[in-house]
Amino acid sequence: MASGSRATPTRSPSSARPAAPRHQHHHSQSSGGSTSRAGGGGGGGGGGGGGAAAAESVSKAVAQYTLDARLHAVFEQSGASGRSFDYTQSLRASPTPSSEQQIAAYLSRIQRGGHIQPFGCTLAVADDSSFRLLAYSENTADLLDLSPHHSVPSLDSSAVPPPVSLGADARLLFAPSSAVLLERAFAAREISLLNPLWIHSRVSSKPFYAILHRIDVGVVIDLEPARTEDPALSIAGAVQSQKLAVRAISRLQALPGGDVKLLCDTVVEYVRELTGYDRVMVYRFHEDEHGEVVAESRRNNLEPYIGLHYPATDIPQASRFLFRQNRVRMIADCHAAPVRVIQDPALTQPLCLVGSTLRSPHGCHAQYMANMGSIASLVMAVIISSGGDDDHNISRGSIPSAMKLWGLVVCHHTSPRCIPFPLRYACEFLMQAFGLQLNMELQLAHQLSEKHILRTQTLLCDMLLRDSPTGIVTQSPSIMDLVKCDGAALYYHGKYYPLGVTPTEVQIKDIIEWLTMCHGDSTGLSTDSLADAGYPGAAALGDAVSGMAVAYITPSDYLFWFRSHTAKEIKWGGAKHHPEDKDDGQRMHPRSSFKAFLEVVKSRSLPWENAEMDAIHSLQLILRDSFRDSAEGTSNSKAIVNGQVQLGELELRGIDELSSVAREMVRLIETATVPIFAVDTDGCINGWNAKVAELTGLSVEEAMGKSLVNDLIFKESEETVNKLLSRALRGDEDKNVEIKLKTFGPEQSKGPIFVIVNACSSRDYTKNIVGVCFVGQDVTGQKVVMDKFINIQGDYKAIVHNPNPLIPPIFASDENTCCSEWNTAMEKLTGWSRGEVVGKLLVGEVFGNCCRLKGPDALTKFMIVLHNAIGGQDCEKFPFSFFDKNGKYVQALLTANTRSRMDGEAIGAFCFLQIASPELQQAFEIQRHHEKKCYARMKELAYIYQEIKNPLNGIRFTNSLLEMTDLKDDQRQFLETSTACEKQMSKIVKDASLQSIEDGSLVLEKGEFSLGSVMNAVVSQVMIQLRERDLQLIRDIPDEIKEASAYGDQYRIQQVLCDFLLSMVRFAPAENGWVEIQVRPNIKQNSDGTDTMLFLFRFACPGEGLPPEIVQDMFSNSRWTTQEGIGLSICRKILKLMGGEVQYIRESERSFFHIVLELPQPQQAASRGTS
């Protein structure tokens, strides 16, 4: 369909149809019950399927390469044998695997075809000082007027046409001035950024656009005849093209957001207006690789293609790869005979023409275009970001690997048409801007999708807190609110709980029997057609139930979602093998390619989307754990919610890292040479560093407590600051905002202070927002300078080149975007001297070739800002980053202002750069380093948290097996200790919520237990360290303790006692060291006449024991400096929740923990119904 790229006649009857039946199994991934949908994401929150999706995409691409190669081979063989290519028969033939040689030959034919289009000529030149000719097209001599039989007027009547021959110096083919341009271009780091060069033939002085790019063996020069001999066209033409693009881009940017269709409709209108083609379309690739025309602008008498769908093979994978390398592809005349490229026999393979603007279309594609009535075409790639970044890829001919081909803008013309390179260059800029705008719209849609996923996760947790599993269908919200469906059902313990439009109970039992027989080895199934999935009773269900998603919870419990019949009308470009189709299917005819017929899909529902299946999968995982724990006799689902949803343990381990970050940041803020201040939630100052005090004349003591809005800023900044505060307190952080601060005391006479600030939300350790911090940069000096510049006050050149450090980096542009000023500060910042850049194009040469940018999108954004400024539209604080001469990455804010004569006529633009100070950059770098380190730790902990569950299940299972064997008394005691330790660890993993411990809402699971078993479990957990450190363990535990029973949360008590004891073991002196355990029971009589058991624990060691900072951390509620201290602090709080308390006591010769724990007696607890 996209005629500029089609390289095979491929037409797949089944490989890419959106209406194809979709049903997928859910295959078991681990013994723990984790599952993932084949081909989809299996993550609990909708985000776990990225890797699977990428793998599936690669798999599809590989499969399509194979099919492309097979059909290409059939087409080539038919041409060689003189037989016509039987289009229909080739499609119907059973697919046979293509050999590696066949695929390699196919790719070589596409990328190294050895022919070009005749509207220009191609040279390949050695990339060295010799400029040796490695290859040339057969028409080179004719186009350059170098053939001996040519009689063309020449500036030099004695000139003799130099021969076009392999090994000759390519510079001799062109005028001396053109040769100099080529030499300069060959020396450039990124040669493609200089395109097009304006060069002339040596003999006739005929002008050409020279489009250069590097390949593996040298430099390819595509020469396209130009239409005028104006020597200024080299610059003026490029600038005019940019202006055309910027004008269209400005109209795109003015469109309202949130409407991708309007954006696409506008693009096709602009492109048709720019290029004059008969038809312009936006062609979008769907996830299954098939294409759809989503927007169209055409001549009135042409047949519309809007809404047509085309198979994935219509745009072969090889062509898609070419579009990623060369974003714009023009075919001037599909009937024109291709021109052969003659190359040096020493070259080991045909010349690579991937980046050539003249590369000839494949014969099959030319036939395809002719059959459909399209003689000329222009196809442009629409590239969007798929995540990630690429700091080094800046060539216009290539793109970062993190980018993906979203679709194409396709232009068709019914007669030969060739548009000049500068206009194609403008279209390329427009496509880059379209991709950026489209990317923002898609990101917005993605954010809305993420919000929906978060709402779904909340819904899952709410469901899990229900008292009974049946609550998910009997209460509101129910499982029908989870995904879009017409009905849902739960089959639980042999009972059927339906909601909405569902099968009858007899039918559901029949479906379960079918699932068990045909899909018993899976953990679920999703299909948009039960009939196509093979269910024999589908006809009896009728249109009411067509699609179904099912999740297996246990071998006998199921969750179902149902969708009713939806008739889908699919217009498909290229008729499928329809029995009534009498058209000639043996050739690539427009009837078989473009006259779409209506296909009504019956007995099929809307497909189940990946996000919907992720939500179903999450509920399946949680309910499976819930049902399993219910079977084991544990409590309701709340513990599972804490274990699955809240990763509180990550907070515990991460606080140590964050504390060090906080200490370092406080030091940096206090000593920073940039203004930094902070406010609380009421907008009152609670932070004011030395630099802002110096600038404003207001000391730290005087500033504390003052209102930022009412006391410290000018009235014109009030609205801005109020908005900043409001957004930051909600978590929305704004950057690069200018505010105007008042001055006080001696500084007051100097006038206001202008500061560019970033607003950062300040959070406490529980992640609650408690204020706002402003990190600023004083731009008062730059502000004064810019005002003088804009108003042409004084001698601006004296200001530009003043070495005063207050003068910011400044450069200027003339009306043609050529650099006209480059001050001392710019020389120091970039490493490029004024003489090296003045007179060069700022877009492409200065920024692009000298100062490298991150990629083509960055170049496009800079071009838009510069042209807007020249046109009278100023830009402030535009983020602008580049690499200096030494490769150092520079981040700045660009302000561009119109440069005008006294009469108001615009003659260019002044550009100012604002650079963060080294101290602030260092602070941010330290912060980024620590945040990266913390994030890495968090990922490690998340991995450990998830993976520790499987071995725990193994230990539990092994213990259960041992319990069923004949054991001796001591062996049974060992088993009881092992089981107690395993259950303690399981509880820590499940109930990892620090917040519930902090606010006292932790649910204690109380029951009767043996204190002797607790002490055995506690001691067992420290024995290895005791032995490793060669410490003596002294046990002072009365026999009555060993036999005593108590009532409480056994495993939390174990956790607390073990942590305190282990701390003594860690810090006991190694030489002649010992650790003592002393336990004393007491009976406490209460005022209500009841008795409680009072247990006194003492864990002691000789010497000082714990370091002071750990003891301090243990009794702190918010500030911690050690990991051990955090653990002890948490245990102290758990102990307090259980009614106990702890003291740490240092005596002259020993140190010890003194722990008091009061517990009810089991009999009295039972009589009171304590829970």
Curated annotation (Swiss-Prot):
PANTHER family assigned to the protein according to its UniProt record, in alphabetical order: OS08G0260000 PROTEIN, PHYTOCHROME 1
BP terms from Gene Ontology: detection of visible light; red, far-red light phototransduction; regulation of DNA-templated transcription
Signal sequence bounds: none
Name of the protein this chain belongs to: Phytochrome B
Domain Histidine kinase per the UniProt entry, residue ranges: 943-1161
Subunit structure: Homodimer.
NCBIfam families recorded: sensory_box
Name of the coding gene: PHYB
This protein's UniProt keywords: Chromophore, Photoreceptor protein, Receptor, Repeat, Sensory transduction, Transcription, Transcription regulation
Start-end of Low complexity biased regions: 1-19
Region Disordered, annotated ranges: 1-53
Domain GAF positions: 259-442
GO molecular function list: phosphorelay sensor kinase activity; photoreceptor activity; protein homodimerization activity
Phylogenetic classification of the source organism: Eukaryota, Viridiplantae, Streptophyta, Embryophyta, Tracheophyta
Domain (PAS): residue spans on this chain: 661-732, 795-866
Family, per entry: Belongs to the phytochrome family.
Gene Ontology cellular-component annotations: nucleus
Modifications made to the protein after synthesis: Contains one covalently linked phytochromobilin chromophore.
